[in-house]
């Protein structure tokens, strides 16, 4: 049996999306995901200004009381392709799976599954990094950190937060948490928020708790996970060092083109075409990430300056 396989649309979705769910951001359910974006996705931004006044008969409606905007999330389209020699895989399969002949121009079908699974797993890691750190340049998405840095509405160092002016460690991690939570606006404090940190910040806080004789912020109940005050802390390996981000899940959206027919995963046995003994892999996919309300995102990137 040839190893040629083709997956398109929803079939590709089931492969790539499941792999992506193994990474922190999707595994923990930190952001909203729209898997079937064709090209663009409108993120709604609705702001109502209250016009509360003393009661009198009649109506005097305020003008411009509702401000409605839409942020357009445009998918970037990418591809990943490579060619490998089937001969490199032959020693890893048994004679039974290869067939009775000592030489067989067809490889077992599970080689295709192995290639797809391994590549999808690596693409999931790539997506995780792009969600947070993509620079928006050729071959990259525009990641959230890049967007936060350029957005004057996002609450950050110099814009609503007085930075601690140093890399975060055991000695100052509590100060960093204090600075981030104190900067939360009322509209964010009253919501269920995600309090996420980079691995180095999580390590610093864990060391602080250990030195203070506490398992976590609740003073020893290890079943609750790591907490700070009333906030549960979650570690996201894709975040750059010295990072703290606080936001509501529904405010940030990842759009994927995995469910439309333009996206695909293909593995082609080139022996069927040019007798080269090679296998060609190609996947085509789209993605973009963005948010509706920058004023409801707290981002603290603490550095030595």
Per-range role (PLM):
Residues 15-95, 125:
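Acidic/polar, low-complexity extended loops/arms that serve as protein-protein interfaces
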Residues 95-182, 300-305:
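Alpha-helical scaffold segments that mediate packing/assembly in large oligomeric complexes
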Residues 124, 128, 199, 239:
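Internal mixed-charge
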